[in-house]
């Protein structure tokens, strides 16, 4: 049986909020089987829990934000969720003492490191996968995103930026998902932005925590970061990273093919909502063995049952 996963014990880190520029403390704790990912605002009295559900993604400008019915939000969840998805973690409690997840270095890599350092624990319940049975597609002008039936989890992703640096890079990528491929090829790709936009955002009290420490910054002609890029195709890889995180609010690892052209947070969430609303387009399945399972997550070292 392929089992559900959580973290072995609590792990904590401190970072900066991208939009506020303030210090943010993040804790990741083990959670019971079938509880999914639940985020908790510990800076509020009493603390407020927000489950990671597609219908609670109510803000997608520059990030993905969960907002409950009282308007309480937790923003910038996508990089953390990409790490959770990439390592196959089904259940976790995410505590944060601010309205946003810390941006860390702008990628999923610090979260992957945290999760691997504390250890991953298999739980005594079968892992559920969301298998795509019918094509689901949403469009917005020339942008589109689609999920199709497929035996594993495959990504076919294209971006289209006219900036000279991005235009010279590879703007298309195909990959077969596995935890090892995610960690090696995707997790270190950083968010990117343009100097002209950053100046405007700061003038409007946004992106106050943004810097070259947590983003690839471009002027009109070049990358401004002294160390350059981590991957030659870091731009398309970061968009794939974002999509991994955005898709994980479906609540399960996806078995299917994800195809995208110029998509972003809003379109990704529309796709998840459209998928879940069409109940004959998907099914939940479990698998007996790693060989049988179509999506490969690395086996946690020293796994124990809870």
UniProtKB/Swiss-Prot annotation:
It is an enzyme of class 3 (hydrolase). One of its GO terms (molecular function) is metal ion binding. One of its GO terms (cellular component) is membrane. Its EC number is 3.5.1.108. The active site is at 265 (proton donor). Pathway: Glycolipid biosynthesis; lipid IV(A) biosynthesis; lipid IV(A) from (3R)-3-hydroxytetradecanoyl-[acyl-carrier-protein] and UDP-N-acetyl-alpha-D-glucosamine: step 2/6. Keywords: Hydrolase, Lipid A biosynthesis, Lipid biosynthesis, Lipid metabolism, Metal-binding, Zinc. This is UDP-3-O-acyl-N-acetylglucosamine deacetylase.
């Amino acid at each position: 049986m392929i089992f559900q996963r959580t973290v072995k014990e609590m792990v904590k880190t401190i970072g900066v909020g991208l939009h506020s520029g303030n210090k943010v403390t993040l804790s990741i704790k083990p959670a019971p089987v079938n509880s999914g990912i639940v985020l908790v605002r510990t800076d509020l009295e009493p603390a407020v829990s927000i489950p990671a559900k597609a219908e609670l993604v109510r803000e997608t400008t520059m990030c993905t934000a969960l907002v409950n019915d009282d308007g309480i939000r937790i923003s910038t969840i996508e990089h953390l969720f990409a790490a959770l998805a990439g390592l196959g973690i089904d259940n976790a409690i995410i505590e944060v003492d601010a309205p946003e997840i810390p941006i860390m270095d702008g990628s999923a890599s610090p979260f992957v490191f945290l999760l691997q350092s504390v250890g991953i624990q298999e739980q005594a319940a079968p892992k559920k996968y969301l298998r795509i049975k019918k094509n689901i597609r949403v469009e917005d002008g020339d942008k589109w995103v689609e999920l199709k039936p497929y035996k594993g989890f495959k990504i076919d992703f294209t971006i289209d930026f006219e900036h000279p640096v991005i235009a010279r890079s590879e703007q298309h990528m195909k990959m077969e998902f596995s935890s090892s491929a995610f960690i090696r090829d995707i997790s270190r790709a950083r968010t990117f932005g343009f100097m002209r936009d950053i100046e405007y955002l700061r003038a409007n009290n946004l992106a106050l925590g943004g810097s070259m420490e947590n983003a690839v910054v471009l002027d009109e002609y070049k990358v401004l970061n002294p160390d350059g890029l981590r991957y030659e195709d870091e731009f398309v890889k970061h968009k794939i990273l974002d999509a991994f995180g955005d898709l994980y609010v479906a609540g399960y690892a996806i078995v299917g093919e994800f195809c995208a052209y110029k998509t972003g947070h809003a379109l990704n969430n529309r796709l998840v909502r459209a998928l879940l609303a069409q109940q004959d387009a998907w099914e939940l399945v479990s698998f007996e063995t790693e060989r049988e399972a179509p999506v490969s997550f690395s086996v946690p070292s020293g796994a124990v049952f809870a």
